[in-house]
Regions:
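Charged, low-complexity, helix/coiled-coil-prone segments
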Residues: 8-23, 125-142
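Short, solvent-exposed loop/turn segments at secondary-structure junctions
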Residues: 13-15, 53-54, 89-91, 152-154
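A glycine-rich, often tryptophan-bearing local segment used as a flexible ligand/cofactor-contacting loop or short
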Residues: 54-139
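Surface-exposed charge patches
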Residues: 18, 73, 156
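Aromatic-Pro/Gly-enriched surface loop or interdomain linker
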Residues: 1-46, 50
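A glycine-centered loop/beta-turn motif at secondary-structure junctions
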Residues: 2-5, 22, 30-32, 44, ...
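A short acidic, often aromatic-flanked loop/helix-cap motif at beta-alpha or helix-coil junctions
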Residues: 34-40, 111-116, 121-122, 153-156
Length: 159
């Protein structure tokens, strides 16, 4: 996280947030209600959106992300960073709140992945068995460069 402390967007604290706290320091929790509040301004430099954010059965995050699309665009344009995990359901347009085009195909299960480009983001994959990496899908139609993909070319990590 280059630009300040991170924030996790979710309904309540997650075990995942504790891991971030342990690795990079204090991690702010931003609830969907807080995110969508018109005058809310966080003091974080990075946003983390966990797996399942688009699945209505588990999360109310996607409507809040869509409601704040223009603020997210300004956040990124001013140097903010964002790490978004899989939508967690068969919702191809679940990334439509991003200021660039990203398509998503839900297909949960382990798969072999190949590092296509060396970058700082490959650190996210260190220590995992790349022959059986758990994914909830892959990207279709995207702007950016694939960092890791399946052997048949389906990107699972883009930057």
């Amino acid at each position: 996280m280059k630009n300040g402390s991170p924030a996790v967007i979710w309904e309540d604290r997650l075990m995942f947030q504790r891991l971030i706290d342990d690795c990079v320091g204090c991690c702010e929790l931003v609830t969907p209600q807080l995110l969508a509040a018109p005058f809310y301004r966080g003091s974080f430099g990075a946003l983390i959106i966990p797996t399942g954010f688009a699945n209505k059965e588990y999360s109310r995050v996607l409507p809040a992300l869509r409601a704040t699309k223009s603020r997210i665009k300004r956040f990124l344009e001013s140097g903010g960073e964002i790490l978004v995990f899989g939508g967690g359901g068969d919702i191809p347009d679940c990334y439509d709140w991003l200021p660039f085009s990203v398509g998503y195909h839900f297909e949960y299960g382990p798969r072999e992945i190949v590092i296509r480009k060396e970058s700082d983001t490959t650190n996210l994959l260190e220590g995992y068995d790349l022959s059986a990496f758990e994914c909830d899908g892959y990207f279709t139609g995207y702007q950016g460069d694939p960092v890791a993909s399946t052997p048949d070319g389906h990107p699972i990590l883009i930057e």
